[in-house]
C-alpha cells in the first residue's frame, strides 16, 4: 500500500504541496489529477524519494520513504516527467545498465530485460541510440526501465503528455495490461482527463497542492451538473421552452444550430422518461436520445477554479 500523510513542500514562500493525505491500495490504478502547477510532480518526487518533504510522511509497501528510502525504492518503478534517459546510450545497453543498478545479473538480468522489451514492444529499436528515437519510443524506453524489476508499485508522471493519439493508445494499453490480474499499485499523474476514464479505477484531484476530490470515475462524474442530463439530437430545431418547464429540469443548453439540446436535471432527479414523452407529444424528429453519466471535465474545471460542485 501507499500511504501519504499530511505531506507538505514549500519553495520559499510558495507552498507547492499543502498537507496532502491519501492512500492507494493494491490492485488500484489511481489517476492523480490536477492542473499545471497543482503540485503533482512535486508529490511524485517526494513519494519516490527524490525530494525531501518539509512536513508529513509517505510510505510504500510499509517502508518510510525518508528513513527507509532504498527499501521503498526497491518496491517501485518510476517514470519521471519527460522520461529522461541517457541519450547517447543504445536502448539495449541502457536497459542492461538499469538492470545492473537494480541488482539483476546473469540469466535473470537477460530474462527481465527481454520481458520488459516485449511488454513495451521495443524489439525493433534495441540497437538505436535513445536520442534518435521518437518521443513515443523514448517514453516506451522509460516505461521499460520502470517495469524492469517487476515492481509492486508503478509511479508514472505524465506518461502520455505530448504523444500523438496512436502513441497514447499504446501506452494506455500497456498500463492496462500491467494492472490486469495483478495486485500491483499504479499511480498515474496527469492533467489529461481522458486518461482517467481510459485506465483508472480511482482518481484524486488536487489544486494548489491541496486535496479537492477522491473517488472512482463514476463517483466523480456523478458530481457533475451533467449527471442524468438528457441530450437530444434533432432533425430540425425545436422550441426548448416546453423542456424548461418540465418538473426536475434546471436548464436547457442549445447548440449553435439548434439541432442538439442538453436538458440538465436537478440533483437527484431522473428526467429521461419525461423528456422522451414530451418529444413524442411535440412530434419532434429525434435522431438520438441519450442520458449522460456526467462529465469529468466539468467536475475538474469546477473544483480547480474554486466553484462549488
For the regions a language model picked out, list residue spans one by one.
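Conserved ABC transporter NBD signature motif
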Residues: 56-67, 71-72
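Conserved ABC ATPase "signature" region
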Residues: 96, 100, 107-125
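Conserved ABC ATPase signature
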Residues: 129-136
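Conserved catalytic motifs of ABC-family nucleotide-binding domains
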Residues: 150
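Catalytic Walker B motif of ABC-type/P-loop ATPase nucleotide-binding domains
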Residues: 154-158
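ABC transporter nucleotide-binding domain
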Residues: 172-266
Amino acid at each position: 500500500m501507499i500511504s501519504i500523510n499530511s505531506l507538505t513542500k514549500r519553495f520559499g514562500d510558495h507552498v507547492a504541496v499543502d498537507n496532502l493525505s491519501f492512500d492507494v491500495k493494491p490492485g488500484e490504478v489511481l489517476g492523480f489529477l490536477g492542473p499545471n502547477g497543482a503540485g503533482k510532480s512535486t508529490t511524485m518526487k517526494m513519494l519516490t524519494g527524490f525530494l525531501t518533504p518539509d512536513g508529513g510522511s509517505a510510505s510504500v509497501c510499509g517502508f518510510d520513504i525518508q528513513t527507509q528510502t532504498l527499501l521503498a525504492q526497491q518496491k517501485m518503478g518510476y517514470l519521471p516527467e519527460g522520461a529522461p534517459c541517457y541519450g547517447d546510450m543504445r536502448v539495449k545497453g541502457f536497459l542492461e545498465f538499469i538492470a545492473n543498478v537494480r541488482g539483476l545479473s546473469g540469466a535473470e538480468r537477460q530474462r527481465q530485460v527481454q520481458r520488459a522489451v516485449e511488454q513495451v514492444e521495443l524489439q525493433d529499436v534495441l540497437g538505436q541510440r535513445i536520442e534518435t528515437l521518437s518521443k513515443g519510443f523514448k517514453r516506451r524506453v522509460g516505461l521499460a526501465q520502470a517495469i524492469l524489476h517487476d515492481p509492486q508499485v508503478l509511479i508514472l508522471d505524465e506518461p502520455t503528455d505530448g504523444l500523438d493519439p496512436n502513441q497514447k493508445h499504446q501506452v494506455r494499453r500497456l498500463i492496462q495490461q500491467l494492472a490486469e490480474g495483478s495486485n500491483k499499485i499504479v499511480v498515474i499523474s496527469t492533467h489529461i482527463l481522458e486518461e482517467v476514464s481510459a485506465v483508472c479505477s480511482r482518481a484524486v484531484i488536487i489544486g494548489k497542492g491541496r486535496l479537492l476530490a477522491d473517488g472512482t470515475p463514476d463517483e466523480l462524474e456523478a458530481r457533475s451538473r451533467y449527471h442524468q442530463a438528457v441530450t437530444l439530437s434533432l432533425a430540425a430545431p425545436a422550441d426548448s421552452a416546453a423542456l424548461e418547464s418540465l418538473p426536475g429540469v434546471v436548464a436547457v443548453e442549445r447548440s449553435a444550430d439548434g439541432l442538439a439540446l442538453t436538458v440538465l436535471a436537478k440533483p437527484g432527479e431522473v428526467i429521461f422518461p419525461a423528456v422522451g414523452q414530451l418529444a413524442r407529444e411535440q412530434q419532434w424528429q429525434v435522431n438520438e436520445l441519450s442520458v449522460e453519466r456526467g462529465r469529468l471535465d466539468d467536475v475538474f474545471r469546477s473544483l480547480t477554479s474554486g466553484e462549488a460542485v
